Structure formats: C-alpha cells, structure tokens
C-alpha cells in the first residue's frame, strides 16, 4: 500500500483520507522500511499536504496514542508547532498556568526541544515539574490541579518507527504539524501556534474535521508561533462550526509594541526563571505577551467572552499570585507520584 501511495504522491496527486490512513497505519505498525518512510513524507511535503491528508494522519496518530479522558466537561490545549526560529521564552507554557489559574482546565501536550533551546518539557522540568507520568496520573493532575502535561513520547509510542527517517532527513515534514493535532485527551478547545501564515486556515479546518468546539490557530507576522506583541498576528478562529480569519493588533488592546529582543529567551533554566519572575509580578514586554496569549486561552476556554475580558482576568490572575500558586501546586502534585512510581518499579 505504501508503494502505491508514494508513486501517487510523486506524480503530484492528492491522497484520499482513507488512502493516507492506510499508508500512515503501515508506518505506525512498523511495516514500512526507513527508505519508504523517508520517500513518503518527502513526497508529501513536496506536493503539499491537503486538509484531508492532514486530517487522516491526525486520526491515525490519535487512534494509536495512549488515551486519557479527564472527567471534566471542557478543557483546552496550548500547543504550537514550534520551529519558528524566533528563540522566545516558553510563552505557551506560561500561558497554560495562567489559564488554569483563571479557571480553564488545561491538557497541555508537548515535547522536548526540536528547534529552540527549550521545549515545553524542558522548561517544565526546570520549573521542578515531574513530567514522567503515566496516563492515569496525568488525568488525575487535570482533574485535581486543573492542568496536566501530556509528554508526547510517553503517549505516542508508535511514532518511534518514523523517528529515524525524520531525524536523518532534517527537513520539515507532516510530522512537524501533526504534534499539536494529536492531543491524546481529545481536548475540545485549542490555541495552536503555527510557524507559517499559510497554515492557519488549513490547520483550523483540520481541527474542525477532528471535532474541535473552539480554537484559535495563530501566526505572529514576525514569524512567531504565538500571538506576538511586536506586530500583528494572523488568526483563524474556529467557532460555531466555521472558520473565520482576521488580524489581531496588540495595540488595539492597550498593549505596547515590543521589539523581538524584548521577548528572547535562553535555555530551559533561564526560561524557567523568566516565567517565575513574571508570576512574581515583574512588569514589561515579557509579561505583556503572556497576558495577551493567556487572554486567548481564557477565551478559547470559555471563561471569558472576549480577548479584552481575557486580558483583565489574566492580569488579575498574575497580580493576585494565583498563577504562581497554580505552578507551585502543579510542581508539588506531580512530584507526589515519584515515590509511588519508584515503589511500583
């Protein structure tokens, strides 16, 4: 089946959803050779991935992942594609804590760094979080603390078959955009940052196909996979079963324009310190960008009805110390599992 799919892609023809499901299933089951995997993902990239193809791949990855079903009504993910090359600190990770402290349940999906100095898993470890939890423990985190971290390699074990060819190719492939689409908790709300402005509508339509209720797919026009504060941001919003695309300007919300240098991060330890300083009340451009992105998460999380209202709540959550409290609570709760895990071997 994979040979047939490769020859079709090489001719520049699109695959149907069922064809790509069959092809990716073959890869995830370990039935494809490294050469076939490399050819398949390269040919797909050259042709350009369609909404149907990305939807099909996301369905396969979701089906093969270890699932969690938190016993809460509605929860969101704040996970970007990464790979934007802007070397900012971990904005979406900071945002997850502000959203959780503001009353949104968060199932944060993430991994170690791919392109930056610090991925969400790296900075969470530097903050003191125990990320090595099984699905039952992550579910408990979401239900009891309001936030859980879904560490991708633990939940997506069948991805290991594609890891070698991906690494050896060293180019962006469909797997770079599948990560944020394959949250094993099947979150119904999402703030999803992408590295390319052409991806916002594409990804929003895929999320719609996957049954999302509300989402903002965002690309800062400075290249950031976040809502930026240096210029405008392209947003494709999923709401009421449709996709609406617009530009978001930070100055319209009373946020001062920053320079890219104002938002630079460092390694995991440095980024952890930046997040703690913001949560301890430090003002400035780094706090501003966390507030703006948190406003989007609170809006997608349905606890506020507009970005303006979200900004007010995000500021209140940080200023009152609730965001810091939520971070400390999460650190403590995730570490309470360590002794149990060690005892159970």
From Swiss-Prot:
Binding site for anthranilate 2: 166
Protein name, per record: Anthranilate phosphoribosyltransferase
Gene Ontology BP, a term: L-tryptophan biosynthetic process
GO MF annotations in UniProt: anthranilate phosphoribosyltransferase activity; magnesium ion binding
InterPro entries membership: Anthranilate_Pribosyl_Tfrase (IPR005940), Glycosyl_Trfase_fam3 (IPR000312), Glycosyl_Trfase_fam3_N_dom (IPR017459), Glycosyl_Trfase_fam3_N_dom_sf (IPR036320), Nuc_phospho_transferase (IPR035902)
Organism placement in taxonomy: Bacteria, Bacillati, Bacillota, Clostridia, Eubacteriales
Superkingdom of the source species: Bacteria
Source organism per UniProt: Acetivibrio thermocellus (strain ATCC 27405 / DSM 1237 / JCM 9322 / NBRC 103400 / NCIMB 10682 / NRRL B-4536 / VPI 7372) (Clostridium thermocellum)
Range of residues in the leader sequence: none
Pfam families: Glycos_trans_3N, Glycos_transf_3
Cofactor binding summary note: Binds 2 magnesium ions per monomer.
